[in-house]
Regions:
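Conserved N-terminal beta-strand and adjoining loop/helix that marks the start
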Residues: 1-15
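Short hydrophobic/aromatic beta-strand or adjacent loop that forms the aromatic wall/cage
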Residues: 2-6, 77-82, 100
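Short secondary-structure boundary/capping segments
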Residues: 7-8, 18, 73-75, 92-97
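Short aromatic/basic micro-patch
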Residues: 27, 77, 105
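Active-site segment of metal-dependent pyrophosphate-handling enzymes
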Residues: 52-90
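NUDIX/MutT-family hydrolases
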Residues: 82-84, 93-125
């Protein structure tokens, strides 16, 4: 199982998702946890790498965990440990790193363009 951390930014039934180079589906900003890292440390590192965003530990709040289908690895599962940010961020001014080819808001019902584990998150935590 691939253990990951992710930033879940949701408003008005839309999620902020990113697309990584050479991948079709969009998923939460974040990534794999390196050996010896806490969940928060891993998310801080990933957000700095992907979005050039530096957040203090106190600005991140754990909101839940799901296990879903890994993307793009077939026949693998991923554990997503989700966090939200406890301060306002102007997402239109956030610059992505070279590995991120796109960042945009998706309606939670746009399952065709969203990675499987993100759709699992939506079913578990967002859809009522």
């Amino acid at each position: 199982m691939i253990k990951c951390v992710c930033l879940v930014e949701e408003k008005n039934h839309q999620l902020l998702l990113v697309q990584v180079r050479h991948r079709d589906k969009y998923y939460f900003p974040g990534g794999k946890i390196d050996e010896g890292e806490s969940l928060v440390e891993a998310l801080q590192r990933e957000l700095k790498e992907e979005l050039r965003l530096e957040l203090a530990k106190g600005e991140l709040e754990f909101i839940g965990t799901i296990v879903g289908e890994a993307y793009p690895q077939p026949n693998m599962l991923t554990e997503l440990n989700g966090f939200k940010v406890n301060r306002a961020i102007d997402w239109s001014k956030v610059e992505t790193d070279h590995e991120i080819t796109d960042m945009k808001w998706f309606d939670i019902n746009d399952s065709e363009n969203i990675a499987p584990a993100v759709n699992t998150w939506i079913k578990e935590f967002i859809n009522d």
